[in-house]
Amino acid sequence: MQVVHTIAEARRARAAFDELGFVPTMGYLHQGHLALVERARAECPAVAVSIFVNPTQFGPHEDYARYPRDTARDLALLEAAGVDLVFIPTVEEMYPAGFGTYVIQPAADEVLEGAARPGHFRGVATVVCKLFNIIQPTKSYFGQKDAQQTVVVRQMVRDLNIPVEIVIVPTVREPDGLALSSRNVYLTPEQRAAAPVLYRALRAAAERYAAGERSGEVLRAVMREVLSTEPLAKPEYVSVAHPHTLRELDQIGPEGALLSMAVRFDQVRLIDNWLLL
């Protein structure tokens, strides 16, 4: 496994491969990340992973400085998973003095995570675009857990004619339903016991949908009701949206819907979603 830190090194290393699967990460890897790597390994002759905690996607009062990091552990996991190339740039390598070009999708900033975290998707789209230009993968793998991110990346690839296939991998969950996230490490034991309420709320709405309910407001109410059973859970938003535009739905049509939510447990903010088809 080759580990590189500069863009020039990454490009030289990339030249050794024909087809390449790519998994961009912020490190502190868990089984969800490894599921992306496993899928890439199954579909591509070589796999690259990036580890970069991207400052431009964090707001001024968010957790950039304390975001968990453990590069040695990450590298051991990636080597065991059969990864060929790991790119670990510094902030200065990715954003040198004078950097001033960003990828912006105004529509993404108006809804869900974009509305809750101003500037977040400007940072996400910009760093993913840069990584695609540096690594030039054949396919790139993203988790369904970050549903809006997958929509943003797919639109960017389409709009900017970036020659990469985007592959979305289902969310990996704990046995009690909690979606795997690097931020779960912040949860106290009491918060961790309460956190599966997100999954229960989504599942309850999905069951109502399966039984024939098509009202967006009814399904939002179902999710809020389940969340209200957990005193530690403070919902930031609860959404029933179109799966492509992410606009809120009054009635769910033939294209289905994306159920999603952001919930705070004191300082810890968790997101989760469920795709209704």
Swiss-Prot record:
Residues holding ATP: 26-33, 143-146, 172, 180-183
Places the protein is found: Cytoplasm
Gene field: panC
Positions bound to (R)-pantoate: Q57, Q149
List of catalytic residues: H33 (proton donor)
Gene Ontology biological process terms from the UniProt entry: pantothenate biosynthetic process
GO molecular function terms listed in the Swiss-Prot or TrEMBL record: ATP binding; pantoate-beta-alanine ligase activity
Organism: Chloroflexus aggregans (strain MD-66 / DSM 9485)
Protein keywords: ATP-binding, Cytoplasm, Ligase, Nucleotide-binding, Pantothenate biosynthesis
Organism superkingdom: Bacteria
Known partners and oligomeric status: Homodimer.
Name of the protein this chain belongs to: Pantothenate synthetase
